[in-house]
Amino acid sequence: MGNFSEIKTRNDFADFLRIPRNKLTHILYVKKPDSYYKTFEIPKKNGDKRKICAPSGDLKSLQVKLANALWVHQKSIWTSAGTKPNISHAFEKGKSIVTNAKVHRNKRFILNMDLECFFDSFHFGRVCGYFEKNKDFLLPREVSIIIAQIACYNGRLPQGAPSSPIISNLICQVLDMHLLKIAKKYRLDYTRYADDLTFSTNNRVFLDSYEDFVKETTALILKAGFTVNKKKTRLIYRDSKQEVTGLVVNKKISVNHTYVRTTKAMAHQLYTTGEFLIDGAPANIRQLEGRFSFIDQIDLYNNRLDESKHDAYHLNGRELQYRAFMFYKNFYAHEVPLIVTEGKTDVRYLKAALMKLYTQYPSLIEKDDTGRFIFKIKFFQRSKRWKYFFGMSLDGGDAMKVLYRYFTGKKVAKDYFSYFQRITGRRQLSPVILLYDNEIESKKPLKAFLNEDAGITELQKQELKNNLQLRLLPDTMRAFLKYKAKLRRYGLKAQTVLFPDQRRNHR
């Protein structure tokens, strides 16, 4: 079964999503969907709280499958019609606040409107009725009710569920088409990003019909089952700072300078005091990371438009601030030891070994009552972002040498380790461990690292050697003695670490 049109019963629906029929029954009628949720609040930009209802376990997995199936169905409809609407820009692959803002760049007038209590507007009956009556689905009543049961919490689409975004977009398509028709009537461009509606135009005489447009649009929105938040309705002129979904769009797309400066100040407060505020309330480091990531998203977009060079050695001021934050979060203020490995597969092997020997390394790993392993260390995960900001390759031991330079300041712009020691007045919370393969031959990563010029004095080198411990995990004792002799040439001491199943072979 590969299409929604083929679903006639609850069992058909379970087969369609490839979930056991008895599991679907258990979720819906035994444990019941509402029992899978946990609710919490996150701060909004204006200081208010946003309520998040997040599902877990089997229900969350089921919602992910439903969302993916709906997205595939939506794409097939667009393909059949030979079109892809450019109205909605939220919750869709390839679209973002940037693509939404780009439509309204460099316009004479911009009108922003907001739908009040957006997700609460999609109640159980509305969700059920959509899948039962919409021409793209026309599902049986029983199946439509099941979808609403899976998707709703306390009778409404919850903000925080994987299936809520795609369902809200599907239901809003009718509203979007009607609003687009009105927008064209008044010679306006129209886009929607979730609950944010934006209209823009270069038409000089739009002000003459502005009140009629707002009145007609508001009436249509009310008829569609939504409410306009009048406090957020605003018309912005070209000679003012025009913002669309948080981005300035007067000439080029950019982030509000006040937002950038405030983020920089928050980071400095975190570095110097260990804490910071957002809108007067205590905040956490993940929120600050979100702000830096938001700013960087716009820099990335603009970098693609110019012909300048952009890499770890050609960063703008905002990117340098983000790089400093990345170092602080991952290499200075991390709460558990961090292990950096040579290759991508090393982490997989290390985790497998620790899980097998977890009883002998309780300081590194433990197993809880449910049988889940809990690591007390973290493994560094490389990404394109680390390559861009730090010049670290996605694989191989040379990247560790590059990382080490940011601890010494040699061959890079800044010694971040000394910088954070100075401004924080605190020591590094946990160690960073560079884990190399025990290959000291020429052209091997370990040899290159040992030859690295850290830019320190002979006295500092000797202190470093005295404090440095190289722990080797050799295949044989003969191999250990061989590498120990080679390391002695560098003035380094070495110890061996043997796993229990190796000790027999080394006696």
Language model region names:
Residues D48, M113, L157-A161, F331-I339, ...:
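Glycine- and acidic
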Residues G94-V103, Y186, A324-Y328, F420-R422:
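Catalytic micro-motifs at enzyme active sites that drive phosphoryl/nucleotidyl and oxygen chemistry
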Residues M1-P43, I52-S76, S80-S121, R126-P140, ...:
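Right-hand nucleic-acid polymerase module
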Residues H310-R507:
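Acidic, divalent-metal-binding catalytic cores of TOPRIM
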Residues T191-D195, K230-K231, H334, L429:
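Short Gly/Ser/Thr- and Asp/Glu-enriched loop/turn motifs at secondary-structure junctions
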